[in-house]
From Swiss-Prot:
GO biological process: antimicrobial humoral immune response mediated by antimicrobial peptide; cellular defense response; defense response to bacterium; defense response to fungus; killing of cells of another organism
Keywords: Antibiotic, Antimicrobial, Disulfide bond, Fungicide, Secreted, Signal
Disulphide bonds in the chain: 69-132, 96-107
Signal peptide, first to last residue: 1-22
Post-translational modification remark: A 9 kDa form is produced by proteolytic processing of a 15 kDa protein.
Known tissue expression: Expressed in natural killer and T-cells.
Keyword Disulfide bond: yes
Protein name (database record): Granulysin
Domain (Saposin B-type): residue spans on this chain: 62-142
Tree of life domain: Eukaryota
SUPFAM superfamilies tied to this protein: Saposin
Length: 145
């Protein structure tokens, strides 16, 4: 018990309390924070995130939202040959009808929130990745932790 308290005190004095309370090893902690420096070029939405206690949760959420975005936008692109406001809007009402009920709920929530910006991106000829990054749903280039 005394050893643990001493280690806790030493870590606090060294100015790294996040490492102590997250129970990460120093090597893993450095890898977990490494993407924050690299993302300024490839993913601006993560460059603004600071090192916080729930870093892994935020990264996992971004990954799931990003995959959802890519899937929906790619399905929309397949459904629409020449994207116009009307054709994308019609396809958007059909895209969430396929799949399981959980997927439908996720898809409907996504479309309710982002449909206008996704439509603008498709009409402008952007790729699915560009649209999802514009929505600030990008994931780190180092991959999931």
């Amino acid at each position: 018990m005394a050893t643990w308290a001493l280690l806790l005190l030493a870590a606090m004095l060294l100015g790294n309390p996040g490492l102590v309370f997250s129970r990460l090893s120093p090597e893993y902690y450095d890898l977990a924070r490494a993407h924050l420096r690299d993302e300024e070029k490839s993913c601006p939405c993560l460059a603004q995130e600071g090192p916080q206690g729930d870093l892994l949760t935020k990264t996992q959420e971004l990954g799931r939202d990003y995959r959802t975005c890519l899937t929906i936008v790619q399905k929309l692109k397949k459904m629409v040959d020449k994207p116009t406001q009307r054709s994308v809007s019609n396809a958007a009402t059909r895209v969430c009808r396929t799949g399981r009920s959980r997927w439908r709920d996720v898809c409907r929530n996504f479309m309710r929130r982002y449909q206008s910006r996704v439509t603008q991106g498709l009409v402008a000829g952007e790729t699915a990745q560009q649209i999802c990054e514009d929505l600030r749903l990008c994931i780190p280039s180092t991959g999931p932790l």
